[in-house]
Amino acid sequence: MMGGGGGGGGGGQMQQVAQEIEQMEQEVEAIDEEIERLREKQTDIDEAIEAIETLDSGSTVQVPLGGDAYIRATIEDIDEVVVSLGGGYSAEREQDGAVSTLETKKETLDDHISDLQEEKAEVETEMEELEQQAQQMQQQQMQQMMQQQEQEDE
């Protein structure tokens, strides 16, 4: 069902290029989603840092229990903060140490986002090259079809 004949497998090649472009579009979308997820984590870290720096002992806060349920709690001691270290481990840190740990996490996220942006740029460049290749193939097919039509008309 390759119309016109004489395409020399160009249709299959076009289909392969189109599939590669589609895969790359999906890869770019996945990278964008991961970048967005990491930026949300950065926002969470910023909010945690702000809370650590602004809350005082005796402040009342809402503590999430899960399932969109909260309780009000009064902070007894803001001098010690429990910070997740990753891998399911947590550690108690003084206020400054907690902020420092969170800032380090944020820097790590920045690095990861930069790596993902570079990867995305590489994929997009490769995708542009493939799109140009597809356009050239399409133009060649059109020229071949026009030549065949001219020959058939003679």
Swiss-Prot record:
UniProt biased composition (Low complexity): 132-154
Complex and partners: Heterohexamer of two alpha and four beta subunits.
GO function term, MF aspect, one: unfolded protein binding
GO cellular component: cytoplasm; prefoldin complex
Organism (species): Haloarcula marismortui (strain ATCC 43049 / DSM 3752 / JCM 8966 / VKM B-1809)
Family: Belongs to the prefoldin subunit alpha family.
UniProt keyword Zinc, yes or no: no
Keywords from the UniProt entry: Chaperone, Cytoplasm
A Pfam family of this chain: Prefoldin
Name under which the protein is recorded: Prefoldin subunit alpha
SUPFAM superfamilies according to UniProt: Prefoldin
Region (Disordered): 119-154
PANTHER family: PREFOLDIN SUBUNIT 5
Encoding gene (name): pfdA
The keyword Cytoplasm appears for this protein: yes
Localization annotation: Cytoplasm
GO annotation (BP), single: protein folding
Signal peptide, first to last residue: none
